[in-house]
Curated annotation (Swiss-Prot):
Species this protein is from: Escherichia coli O6:K15:H31 (strain 536 / UPEC)
Protein name in UniProt: SsrA-binding protein
A molecular-function term among this protein's GO annotations: RNA binding
Alphabetical keyword list: Cytoplasm, RNA-binding
Family to which the UniProt record says this protein belongs: Belongs to the SmpB family.
Length: 160
C-alpha cells in the first residue's frame, strides 16, 4: 500500500478586505456560511474572489452579501450563465440575525465583509458590525502604525 502524502495546507484565507479595517471601527465579528453555486466553489478554490467592495444587506429576516466578485473559470461554467457579482445569501442562525438587526438599526452602523476563508470543506465569510471612521481617525491609525515600526527599529538597533 502506498502512503498518502502529508497534506501541507496553505493559507485557508481566500480573500481579505483590508479596506474595511481602514475605513471602519469593527465592533463585533460574526462567522457566516455562504449559499454558493458549483462554479463559485470551483472559482473560490482557485482563489478568484474579491470582497473589497462588498457589504451585507439585511432584508426580510435574512442577510445577503452584495458586491462580492467571484470570477468564473472558463472550464467550470460552460453550460451555466454566471453572474460574478450576484447577491449571495448568508447562512446565520436566528440569534445572530437578531443581533445584527438590532445593531444596524442604530445610527451609523453597517455590516461589512472582512474575510472569506475555508473552514474544513465549507466556505465561510467573516462579517463585522462597523461604524465609519472620520478622516482624523484614519490619520491617527497611520501615525500609530508608523510609531510601532519606528519603535521596533529603535529596539532592534539598540542591542548592537
Amino acid at each position: 500500500m502506498t502512503k498518502k502524502k502529508a497534506h501541507k495546507p496553505g493559507s485557508a484565507t481566500i480573500a481579505l478586505n483590508k479596506r474595511a479595517r481602514h475605513e471602519y471601527f469593527i465592533e463585533e465579528e460574526f462567522e457566516a456560511g455562504l449559499a454558493l453555486q458549483g462554479w463559485e466553489v470551483k472559482s473560490l478554490r482557485a482563489g478568484k474572489a474579491n470582497i473589497s467592495d462588498s457589504y451585507v444587506l439585511l432584508r426580510d429576516g435574512e442577510a445577503f452579501l452584495f458586491g462580492a466578485n467571484i470570477t468564473p473559470m472558463a472550464v467550470a461554467s460552460t453550460h451555466v450563465v454566471c453572474d460574478p457579482t450576484r447577491t449571495r445569501k448568508l447562512l446565520l442562525n436566528q440569534r445572530e440575525l437578531d443581533s445584527l438587526y438590532g445593531r444596524v438599526n442604530r445610527e451609523g452602523y453597517t455590516v461589512v465583509a472582512l474575510s472569506l476563508y475555508w473552514k474544513n470543506a465549507w466556505c465561510k465569510v467573516k462579517i463585522g458590525v462597523a461604524k465609519g471612521k472620520k478622516q482624523h481617525d484614519k490619520r491617527s491609525d497611520i501615525k500609530e502604525r508608523e510609531w510601532q515600526v519606528d519603535k521596533a527599529r529603535i529596539m532592534k538597533n539598540s542591542h548592537r
